[in-house]
Every structure is written in structure tokens, then in C-alpha cells.
A protein has these predicted regions:
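Nucleotide-activated sugar donor-binding and catalytic core shared by glycosyltransferases
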Residues: 1-32, 38-46, 158-172, 176-185, ...
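Conserved nucleotide-sugar donor-interacting segment of glycosyltransferase catalytic cores
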Residues: 88-159, 211-214
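Donor-nucleotide binding loops and adjacent catalytic segments primarily
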Residues: 209-330
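Generic beta-sheet signal
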Residues: 34-36, 53, 110, 131-134, ...
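A short helix->loop->beta-strand "cap" motif at the edges of active sites that frequently abuts
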Residues: 48, 124-127, 203, 290, ...
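Short gly/pro/ser/thr-enriched loop/turn and capping motifs at secondary-structure boundaries
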Residues: 39-41, 57-61, 130, 134-141, ...
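Phosphate/nucleotide-donor binding subsite
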Residues: 49-106, 160-164, 172, 176-178
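Short loop/helix-cap segments at secondary-structure boundaries that form the rim of catalytic
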Residues: 39-46, 118-123, 141, 214-223, ...
Length: 429
């Protein structure tokens, strides 16, 4: 069976689908992945066939406009920025998604590509499965991520209203470009949202995050939205992409040389002054009497600027969270679902410094569940970072985090379960 997986976004958006693709290849299927130009190499090193699909989102976020939008912490502002980029890239991405899906017997999308994957699947007459890394459908338990302050607990009616507003805004922003694609595919135009069309067609929407993170939500959704947990990369793929490189021996040696440090992961945070951020981390660690491990991710943090003392270590490039987190005392990061899952799975109290999209929601959930704290990166100051780090280092918070880790379902079978859903969906078509 030929499986097409058109993707866009950052590595965090792409990696779970790569894990699924490798599982499907292991079952004898032919898999082709569409990936942003900056991640084609990552997909190929992991062991999958890749084609270019979509813009370089990292480049967009690193631009001056992207950095301003990220620093503002507004999901709606980022949605507008992405909409503007789509206006420039729409026709090209339409072609790229069509090319990736050519000859496919089943298509697997994510929330970021289902707008295009659904009409392509409809025109081709093949089934579609979509993977969602956060709650991105209307519900009464949680508002649209970023629409309301994360610490609010509004009634179900308000939550559903936030989804209606966001979905209508998204529909209006993207309708023109998507109807252009529909015309190219020989489909009639529509003003119905992608969510409504997928519900009409019974498309499976696999929730690739843990249900323990969203109490009350699984009960609101039926079997069309199964919760499978986070999809990890297998060890061989991680070695191939450099996540278990020899540099980790030096990191592990440093970790084990003294007391467990606090992990600071910057991920895609909009860092404009590297020296100031590193200085802030140093002062916070000194004030709290702890060591700090700083992971730069693909932010603009430059190790050349890392004029740190021996109690703060800076690492640039891929970092194996499952090797590092069990050796840490607590974690501070941007709140992407992959990093959030790994820090909580390791039993670490977690401070989320959210930027945008789903991150404020995960930060709010970490705080609401009593296993950490949350602050918007746009509001982050040295005092707030110190206060948040002090909070997650409290023994009672750490104990709750360790207890919560036992409630997270095993992620070992998440990829297998998702592959089963893909195969069963294709078999029913």
C-alpha cells in the first residue's frame, strides 16, 4: 500500500509523522513524506523517502515579522502571519501536496496540512487519516488555544464560542486559497470549514497526546478521535538524525558530576539578546543555588555567546530528552507537546514559558494539574523566571509530578496503534 504523508511546520510537527511512517514501512508499505525544505534531510536521515512540501516555517519564525508575532504571544497574530505567507506560497504548496499524494492509496495529514489533504483525498477517492497534536476541535472542556488566558476556567458555552470564533476566522483567511485548490482538483467551491467536511466524511482524527493531560475531553469525543499518546522516534532513527550523537556522552558526564540541574530548553523562543538570556539563566541558577543545562534548540541562541560559569552548560543541536530529563531536577521550556510529554514522563515539575499556538494551553494544563507552572514568554522577566523555577523546585510539586508520570499511558504502542488505524481505514475504503 502506498501511503502519502504531506507535512509542514517545525520539527515538532514533523517528527511524530516520521515515527508513523517508519512503522508503516516496517509493515511492508511504501511511504512518501512531504516535508518543509529545511526538514527534508531530517526525514531522509531517519530512513524515509521525502519530497519538498510547504515553506520553511523556521525561516518565517526567525524573520523580523515572525519574531515580533512570537514575542507578542498572540495565536491570532500568528494565524494572520501564516495566512500572509500562504498568500505568497499557496499555489506552490497546492502543487506540492498534490505531487506528494500522487498514486497514494491512503493519505495521512496533520492539523497543519489537512486543509489541503482533505480535498486532495476527496478528488482522488482515497481515505484520509489526520493526526492532531493538541485539541483542535470544538469542545466544552477547553477553549481554543491562546483565545483566553490559560488560567481561566470558563463555562462550556464560552469554550465552544471561542472555537466557533477561531474556526470562522481560519475559514475566512484560508477559503480563497483552498477553493483555488478545489477548482484545480475539479471540486466545487465550499465555504464549509475543513473540520465540518471531515466530520461529514467520518475522517479519523487521531489524538497523538496523552488523555491524562486533558481531563474530561476524551469523554466528550467519540471513537472517531481516539487518544493514542505521543509518537516517539525509535532508537535507530534517533541515532541516524544525530539525537544520540557522541556529544551526549559529554552532557551525561556533566549531568552526573554534581547534583541534578534545572533544564532550560529554548526551542523556538524568540530570543533577541542571547547574552541577556544566558545572563538571566545564570543569575536565576545562582540565586536558587542550582546548576542549569541550557538547550538552544533552533532558536537564535549562539553557543559562541555562552560566557557561562561551570554551573551552567549550553548545548546546541538535537538533544535526547529521555537521556537528559531523568538526570534533571526540573524543567523549563516553551511547552511544545513533545517536550512537555517528555518532561512530565520523566516525572519533572515543569515551568512552561509559552510562546503561542498550543503552548499556552499546555502551560495552563501543567499548572492546573499541579505539576508545574506557566508564564507567557512575552511577559518573562528575571523575577518571574526565578519565581517559577523556585515553585517547580518545591518538594511537593516534584512529588505530584512524579505521581502524575505514573498516570501517563505507555507511549510504546502509540505508533503501533496509529498505524493500525491507518491500515483499517484503508481497508474499509
Amino acid at each position: 500500500m502506498r501511503v502519502a504523508i504531506p507535512l509542514t511546520g517545525t520539527r515538532g510537527d514533523v517528527q511524530p509523522a516520521v515515527a508513523l511512517g517508519l512503522e508503516l514501512v516496517g509493515r511492508g508499505h511504501e511511504v512518501v513524506v512531504g516535508a518543509p525544505p529545511n526538514l527534508v534531510g531530517f526525514v531522509e536521515r531517519a530512513g524515509l523517502k521525502a519530497q519538498t512540501c510547504g515553506p520553511d516555517v523556521q525561516q518565517l519564525y526567525s524573520s523580523e515579522a515572525g519574531q515580533r508575532a512570537l514575542a507578542a504571544g498572540s495565536s491570532f497574530r500568528l494565524m494572520r502571519l501564516v495566512g500572509e505567507q500562504m498568500a505568497e506560497y499557496a499555489d506552490r504548496m497546492n502543487r506540492e501536496v498534490i505531487e506528494v499524494c500522487e498514486g497514494a492509496e491512503v493519505i495521512v495529514s496533520t492539523m497543519l496540512t489537512e486543509d489541503r489533504a482533505h480535498p486532495v483525498a476527496t478528488a482522488m477517492g482515497v481515505p484520509l487519516v489526520s493526526m492532531h497534536g493538541f485539541p483542535c476541535r470544538s469542545n466544552g472542556a477547553y477553549p481554543f488555544p491562546g483565545a483566553l488566558p490559560p488560567h481561566w476556567s470558563p463555562p462550556a458555552m464560552v469554550n465552544r464560542a471561542s472555537w466557533a470564533l477561531a474556526e470562522n476566522l481560519r475559514r475566512l483567511v484560508f477559503a480563497r486559497y483552498l477553493n483555488r485548490l478545489r477548482r484545480e482538483l475539479g471540486l466545487p467551491p465550499t465555504m464549509a470549514s475543513t473540520a465540518a467536511q471531515m466530520a461529514r466524511d467520518g475522517v479519523p482524527e487521531v489524538q497523538i497526546y496523552d488523555p491524562a493531560l486533558v481531563p474530561g475531553l476524551p469523554q466528550q469525543w467519540g471513537s472517531r478521535r481516539p487518544f493514542v499518546g505521543f509518537l516517539p522516534l525509535e532508537r535507530a532513527a534517533r541515532e541516524a538524525v544525530g539525537e544520540l550523537a557522541t556529544e551526549h556522552a559529554d552532557v551525561v558526564s556533566w549531568l552526573e558530576a554534581d547534583e541534578p540541574p534545572v533544564y532550560f530548553g529554548f526551542g523556538s523562543m524568540p530570543i533577541r539578546d542571547t547574552g541577556a538570556v544566558l545572563g538571566m539563566v545564570e543569575r536565576v541558577c545562582a540565586q536558587l543555588g542550582v546548576r542549569g543545562l541550557v538547550s538552544a534548540g533552533w532558536s537564535d541562541l549562539d553557543v559562541a555567546d555562552a560566557r557561562t560559569d561551570s554551573r551552567v552548560k549550553v548545548v546546541v543541536g538535537p538533544l535526547a530528552h529521555d537521556l537528559v530529563f531523568p538526570r534533571c531536577a526540573a524543567a523549563v521550556h516553551h511547552g511544545g507537546i513533545g517536550t512537555t510529554f517528555e518532561s512530565l514522563r520523566a516525572g519533572l515539575a515543569t515551568l512552561v514559558c509559552s510562546v503561542s499556538f498550543d503552548q499556552p494551553m499546555w502551560g495552563g494544563q501543567v499548572e492546573r494539574l499541579g505539576v508545574g507552572a506557566h508564564v507567557s514568554f512575552a511577559r518573562l522577566t528575571e523575577d518571574l523566571l526565578t519565581e517559577g523555577a523556585r515553585r517547580i523546585l518545591r518538594p511537593e510539586v516534584g512529588q505530584r509530578a512524579r505521581e502524575f508520570a505514573t498516570r501517563l499511558q505507555s507511549h510504546a504502542d502509540a505508533t503501533v496503534r496509529t498505524a493500525d488505524i491507518v491500515e483499517k481505514t484503508a481497508a474499509r475504503a
